[in-house]
């Protein structure tokens, strides 16, 4: 089946109110006529309100609803209560966020988030009607040891074991080899395709229907120079973009490359 690609910008710990407004204005100008590709941005959570306001009333052919959708970089497993500093799925929903990144290697590393904890976040998002963007991927040492498939399977199975394979209906997986994140080193299109095909096949072993519809993005030093070649691969359904998403022209090139390659 034809899958609609998704290109999502992960701003990480970058930005300000002024930066958010300026970047979104640039993105609206660049992307107002893009079709055939879903687009989302995940600014820091305190700027979601600014972003929501900046995205509304763009005045183009979208009828006041921007082609760019909102996302977020994290979520807590709790809905409310005495959980200082945390953000719930319902709060994200209240700001119009749809695509929520979970399991990013930076969260797994710096905040010691386990596969099982990430699976709980996945479940919380599904229950709230939001779209989990599940990041998976291996370290450089694991890659060199030939453990890429083992690591990816383990991270996917944590969700399947907790929620069932059907939980991946309407969800997104982002394969991000840790050794490629922010390093300038990207997997080759063939390398990325091999892992994406494995991921889809691993899910297909449980459900072919779920595997055929799940969006599998590539992430890890995706930029305006390498995106088009990555998107020629049949199992790469878009990208989770870091640094290049902070510049409207570069991010627009990536989005347009996905739209052109998949339509």
Swiss-Prot record:
Keyword Isomerase belongs to the record: yes
Disulfide bridge partners, by residue number: none
Keywords of this entry: Cytoplasm, Gluconeogenesis, Glycolysis, Isomerase
Chain sites annotated for binding substrate: 10-12, 182, 221, 242-243
GO MF: triose-phosphate isomerase activity
InterPro entries (UniProt xref): Aldolase_TIM, TIM_sf, TrioseP_Isoase_bac/euk, Triosephosphate_isomerase, Triosephosphate_isomerase_AS
Active site residues of this protein: 104 (electrophile), 176 (proton acceptor)
Metabolic or biological pathway, per its Swiss-Prot or TrEMBL entry: Carbohydrate biosynthesis; gluconeogenesis; Carbohydrate degradation; glycolysis; D-glyceraldehyde 3-phosphate from glycerone phosphate: step 1/1
SUPFAM superfamilies documented for this protein: Triosephosphate isomerase (TIM) (SSF51351)
Subcellular location: Cytoplasm
EC identifiers of the protein: 5.3.1.1
NCBIfam families for this protein: tim (TIGR00419)
Similarity comment text for this entry: Belongs to the triosephosphate isomerase family.
Reported function: Involved in the gluconeogenesis. Catalyzes stereospecifically the conversion of dihydroxyacetone phosphate (DHAP) to D-glyceraldehyde-3-phosphate (G3P).
Name of protein: Triosephosphate isomerase
Gene designation per UniProt: tpiA
């Amino acid at each position: 089946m034809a899958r609609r690609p998704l290109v999502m910008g992960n701003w990480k710990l970058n930005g300000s109110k002024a930066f958010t407004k300026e970047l979104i204005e640039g993105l609206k100008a660049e992307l107002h006529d893009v079709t055939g590709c879903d687009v989302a941005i995940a600014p820091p959570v305190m700027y979601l309100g600014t972003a929501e306001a900046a995205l509304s009333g763009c005045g183009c052919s979208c009828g006041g609803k921007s082609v760019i959708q909102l996302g977020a970089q994290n979520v807590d497993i709790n809905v409310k209560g005495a959980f200082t500093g945390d953000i719930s799925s319902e709060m994200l929903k209240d700001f119009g966020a749809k695509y929520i990144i979970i399991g990013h290697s930076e969260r797994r590393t710096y905040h010691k988030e386990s596969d099982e904890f990430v699976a709980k976040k996945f479940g919380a998002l599904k229950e709230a009607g939001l779209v989990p963007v599940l990041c998976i991927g291996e370290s450089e040492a694991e890659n060199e040891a030939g453990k890429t498939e083992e690591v990816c399977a383990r991270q996917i199975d944590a969700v399947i074991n907790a929620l069932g394979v059907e939980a991946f209906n309407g969800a997104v997986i982002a394969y991000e080899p840790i050794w490629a994140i922010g390093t300038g080193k990207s997997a080759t299109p063939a390398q990325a395709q091999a892992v994406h095909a494995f991921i889809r096949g691993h899910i297909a072993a449980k459900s072919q229907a779920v595997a055929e519809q799940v969006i599998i993005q590539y992430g890890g030093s995706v930029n305006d120079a390498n995106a088009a070649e990555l998107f020629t691969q049949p199992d790469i359904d878009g990208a989770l973009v870091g640094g290049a998403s902070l510049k409207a022209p570069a991010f627009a090139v990536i989005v347009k490359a996905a739209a052109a390659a998949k339509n």
